[in-house]
Amino acid sequence: MIEITEFIKKYMTALDQAFPDRVWFAGLQGSYGRGEATEASDIDMVVILDQLSASDIRTYDAMLDTLPCRELICGFLSGRQELENWEPSELFQFCRDTTPIRGSLDQVLSSVTSADIARAIKSGACGVYHGCVHNMLYEKSEDILKGLYKSASFVLQAVHFQRTGVYVRHMADLVSALPPEESAVLQTFMELKNGGAVVFDAMSEQLFSWAGKWAGAPGMMDTE
């Protein structure tokens, strides 16, 4: 597995050389950011420049080619103005799941309202519902099912925050804080992430049932 501290040092040195005095924010998302990485985990880097051009994208691409484990590097690259005016319902999870390396997203996060979080929950659950039905009928893919459980885990983080005002970043902590049905969904996600066997029909039905309760509710379900 990657020694992430050493990787970040090399990454930030290369970033500053590629974009001197232009990095407004840099951070780490995903499993490495949460301390939950496995051998298969991507390195999800977040970079917000003062502004972003097509030429900057090419420069960043060339910079990544100089780094170790290039095939594992992914993430988010944007200009500051674009991020500050992003769809607010998408900013909740984005900001909460990002560990700052340089700068802060607090100002961006402060613009996110309870209604934005509710919209993120509804949209996320609807996406999981549609994906689950589609996969049960057509692709019948274990990998797609795993991805849908991952998406559901993010929705559950938002649901718990909307109920309690507490963002639980680590899934192992969140699973014990949720009601039984939601906890079971998250437990399945954690088992799959750790290499557990896919029981396609049962796991698809579990996810379909949970997501359908949110997708089928008029407006937003009461999270109390």
How does the language model describe each region?
Residues 1-18, 34-40, 46-88:
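Metal-dependent nucleotidyltransferase catalytic core
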Residues 49, 55, 102-112:
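Short, polar/flexible loop-turn hinges at active-site or ligand-entry regions and domain interfaces
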Residues 1-25, 185, 218, 222-224:
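Helical scaffold of the NTase/Pol beta-like nucleotidyltransferase catalytic core
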